[in-house]
Amino acid sequence: MSLNMFWFLPTHGDGHYLGTEEGSRPVDHGYLQQIAQAADRLGYTGVLIPTGRSCEDAWLVAASMIPVTQRLKFLVALRPSVTSPTVAARQAATLDRLSNGRALFNLVTGSDPQELAGDGVFLDHSERYEASAEFTQVWRRLLLGETVDFNGKHIHVRGAKLLFPPIQQPYPPLYFGGSSDVAQELAAEQVDLYLTWGEPPELVKEKIEQVRAKAAAHGRKIRFGIRLHVIVRETNGEAWQAAERLISHLDDETIAKAQAAFARTDSVGQQRMAALHNGKRDNLEISPNLWAGVGLVRGGAGTALVGDGPTVAARINEYAALGIDSFVLSGYPHLEEAYRVGELLFPHLDVAIPEIPQPQPLNPQGEAVANDFIPRNVAQS
């Protein structure tokens, strides 16, 4: 099975070390462009662009990278409760059309009550997933070309429609990650690829089996992906030294503050990440070559595969054997590590190198009439 290898655009900051200004670098458009172009040339399938108040806006960043890349896809967040499904469907179709079919979407429900309150969202965990399920139903139906009437608990639309369809049919693939039961049910029923953070293989296997069974109950099959950091070097010793350097400037106060912030979230996935290290520096290798040091201060994905190219490739293939075909990777700093992964790891894997998409012909049409229909449909109306 050929593997889809993704990289990451660090719109929330970058540097040589975690938890310190030392060794950091400015993250401007030029730097993000360098990373995107490196990923494009090295054969990554796409880049994940993060979302949240600590990040630059993912949609604007993705749009700005379209003209400077050729085949790279952009995995961009959909935010139920923050954006209406109708507006999100228009944005998604536009990004897909402008990029010639290079748009992918990642459903993000949110987990930090403080950040959500700042965005005007005052729903608890179960309510957010109810709203996300309704959002996704409407979003998908619009991209499928339907005129949608929907009267849900959280979302109400009447006569919603999309005049400009996406390039990818039936719609651009939808990714999603969540560890709670309600999250797995949403994934099983509505998404195309279920993402998990980098837990030990036995825990990942358990989650995949749960989601696969729930999807089968809906008569569906879905794909699987995993989000990991990578520290790859020419030797295993050099890789472990690099891992230790990454957290060499962390002090206990910074770790404690970070763990307190993570504790206020209601994310089951974040709780599972925190349980891998319990905020302590010792015993961070939680599974062969799987290191939890990143999660001491970084929310979300908090584990890294550490080793030389053949060793890390062997661990990736262990995850692939569980049914995972997509690996969303990152490393610090992201420009240099994009090259290291491409040069030291890719030769030991069966990497699916994306082709440069050919321009897709669009149906000619005049200006929309009365903001309601396009002229070529007048005779049919």
Curated annotation (Swiss-Prot):
Top-level enzyme category: oxidoreductase
Swiss-Prot/TrEMBL keywords: Flavoprotein, FMN, Monooxygenase, Oxidoreductase
Transmembrane domains' residue ranges: none
Domain of life: Bacteria
Swiss-Prot/TrEMBL catalytic activity: an alkanesulfonate + FMNH2 + O2 = an aldehyde + FMN + sulfite + H2O + 2 H(+)
Record-listed E.C. numbers: 1.14.14.5
InterPro entries found in the cross-reference section: Alkanesulphonate_mOase_FMN-dep, Luciferase-like_dom, Luciferase-like_sf, SsuD_RutA_monooxygenase
Similarity field: Belongs to the SsuD family.
Subunit (UniProt): Homotetramer.
Further remarks about this protein from its record: FMNH(2) which is absolutely required for this enzymatic reaction, is provided by SsuE.
Function field: Catalyzes the desulfonation of aliphatic sulfonates.
Protein name per UniProt: Alkanesulfonate monooxygenase
Gene source species: Escherichia coli (strain SMS-3-5 / SECEC)
The organism's taxonomic lineage, starting at the top: Bacteria, Pseudomonadati, Pseudomonadota, Gammaproteobacteria, Enterobacterales
